[in-house]
């Protein structure tokens, strides 16, 4: 395809949700129910062909349907579970791919089914990160949308244009990055119908020859991250303190209040994303440790009409910031 159409694939993942038992029944899903041994054998063969043909495309091992299958088994058996250990522990001689050409030390997975109850949102990602770190493997979150078990926002059925879904998804992004260590984060699809899986809602006429589209707060909320955090950025530590100056353990994450994360882009610009999940305004005082950066521009997304990454002013270090209820702000260095 690169020679014929000029389209280069940097990455190729041959196996989608091999552990997703629910994918294997009916015509509407795309699961490929291969075992870890079958996946390892196929990837070694693909790697060999890539080397022989001087193709530098990187091969991703598989896209897991559930984080729990990456470090354990969940509604499947050992043949499709323990994926990190199977592919990147040298003791797993039948399935080890850590020294296979064109295969990065990278696992990819989908965050479906692990976002509720709230303790799962935290604990499952911590277990995933512990296993990834043990075997020195990176992680990408490569697909998710709202599903039936996301009951806090009414499940996946029925499109939602409001901050209810936008904040719920932003909380998932925060946990995938902060606790699972995701270096890439991807949503299921851009445009959809009457289901919470598209960033944009489409309305087609009966002939499918005409129609219209309408954006959602979810689309803009993702922009609070993707518009400002650029490829190659690194995440920076955040320390939260109370009014008496005492450090708050995991103070960057209150699942029903404020959640914040910070980043530095390759051009040196710094980015700070703050989610206010609460039903009331919150305030905080912002300190940038080295004090070099003096001014931050603020962009806000909320349920107000027109507040879609809207520039709403700027602040200086040590100034108090008010973040309105049920909103997301991004601070960017000027």
For the regions a language model picked out, list residue spans one by one.
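Aromatic/acidic polysaccharide-binding cleft in carbohydrate-active enzymes
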Residues: 138-249
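C-terminal beta-strand-rich structural cap/linker in extracellular carbohydrate-active enzymes
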Residues: 311-334
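Solvent-exposed beta-hairpin/edge-strand motifs
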Residues: 289-308
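Active-site groove signature of glycoside hydrolases
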Residues: 1-28, 102-105, 110-111
């Amino acid at each position: 395809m690169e020679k014929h159409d000029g389209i280069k694939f940097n990455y190729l993942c041959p196996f989608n949700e091999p552990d997703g038992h629910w994918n294997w029944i009916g015509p509407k899903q795309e699961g490929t129910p291969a075992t870890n041994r079958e996946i390892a054998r196929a990837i070694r063969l693909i790697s060999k062909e890539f080397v022989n043909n001087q193709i530098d495309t990187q091969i991703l091992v598989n896209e897991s349907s559930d984080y729990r299958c990456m470090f354990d088994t969940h509604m499947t058996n050992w043949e499709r579970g323990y994926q990190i250990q199977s592919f990147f522990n040298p003791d797993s001689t039948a399935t080890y791919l850590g020294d296979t050409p064109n295969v990065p030390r990278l696992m990819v997975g989908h965050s479906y089914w692990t976002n509720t109850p709230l303790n799962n949102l935290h604990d499952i990602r911590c277990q995933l990160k512990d296993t990834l770190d043990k075997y020195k493997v990176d992680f990408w979150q490569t697909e998710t949308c709202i599903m039936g078990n996301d009951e806090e926002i009414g499940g996946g059925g029925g499109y939602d244009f409001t901050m209810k879904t936008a904040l719920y998804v932003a909380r998932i992004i925060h946990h995938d990055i902060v606790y699972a260590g995701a270096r890439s984060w991807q949503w299921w699809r851009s445009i959809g119908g009457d289901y919470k899986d598209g960033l944009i809602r489409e309305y087609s006429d009966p002939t499918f020859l005409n129609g219209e589209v309408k954006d959602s707060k979810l689309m803009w909320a993702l922009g609070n991250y993707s518009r400002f955090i650029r490829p190659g950025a690194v995440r920076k530590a955040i320390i939260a303190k109370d009014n008496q100056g005492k450090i708050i353990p995991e103070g960057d994450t209150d699942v029903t209040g404020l959640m914040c994360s910070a980043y530095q882009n390759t051009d040196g610009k710094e980015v700070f994303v703050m989610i206010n999940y609460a039903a009331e305004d919150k305030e905080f005082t912002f300190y940038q440790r080295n004090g070099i950066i003096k001014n931050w521009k603020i962009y806000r997304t909320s349920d107000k009409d027109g507040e879609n990454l809207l520039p709403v002013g700027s602040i200086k270090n040590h100034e108090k910031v008010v973040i309105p209820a049920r909103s997301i702000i991004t601070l960017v260095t000027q």
